[in-house]
């Protein structure tokens, strides 16, 4: 496979994720309305849609250690494009957050509650910039890898905390229980891979 075809495949994953996220958000707003209810449903739907891309990005290295094979090799090879696909999909989620904040709040949002999300989007933006090769080269490979590694841990942790909140505080089991179980499984895999000789 040529470098051009591989690069084209990466771009396709990102574009499809972004377009599908937009389509999903538009569908939710069309069916449930453009008010608070429709926007909230769109937020949940786009979060769920983006989650598999994040899981693939975060679990790739552990899968390669624990169960080497074609699937883990593909995930590891496409980890950058999966991460960018997550960023594209979650950008739609951010637009819906902005839409929700523009509506009459019920209940009004608290600054403390918004802080983790704001920080996470800042981290994610930095990761996207570092994924651009000239920027990564100017920053230095070691610093770029460190930012991507720490940023990925941060993003996955914040997403998991959101799932915990959805299950144990808001009791939205139908939406968040299965994703939470998947997130816990990924953490268990990474711990096992970390303890494995030559682990992550």
Regions found by a protein language model. Give the residues of each.
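Membrane-embedded alpha-helical bundles that constitute the cytochrome b-like, heme-associated redox core
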Residues: 2-200
């Amino acid at each position: 496979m040529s470098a051009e075809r591989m690069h084209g495949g990466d771009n396709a994953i990102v574009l499809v994720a972004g377009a599908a996220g937009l389509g999903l958000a538009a569908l939710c707003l069309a069916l449930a309305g453009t008010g608070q209810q429709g926007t909230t449903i769109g937020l949940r739907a786009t979060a769920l849609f983006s989650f598999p891309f994040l899981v693939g990005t975060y679990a790739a290295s552990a899968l390669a250690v624990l169960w080497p094979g074609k699937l883990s090799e593909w995930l590891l090879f496409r980890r950058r494009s999966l991460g960018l696909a997550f960023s594209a999909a979650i950008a739609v989620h951010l637009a819906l957050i902005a839409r929700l904040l523009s509506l009459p709040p019920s209940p009004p949002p608290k600054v403390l509650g918004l802080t983790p999300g704001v920080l996470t989007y800042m981290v994610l933006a930095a990761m996207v910039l570092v994924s651009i090769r000239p920027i990564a080269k100017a920053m230095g490979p070691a610093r770029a890898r460190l930012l991507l590694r720490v940023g990925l841990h941060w993003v996955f942790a914040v997403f998991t905390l959101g799932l915990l909140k959805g299950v144990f505080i808001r009791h939205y089991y139908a939406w968040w229980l299965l994703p939470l179980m998947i997130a816990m499984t990924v953490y268990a895999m990474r711990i096992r891979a970390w303890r494995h000789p030559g682990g992550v």
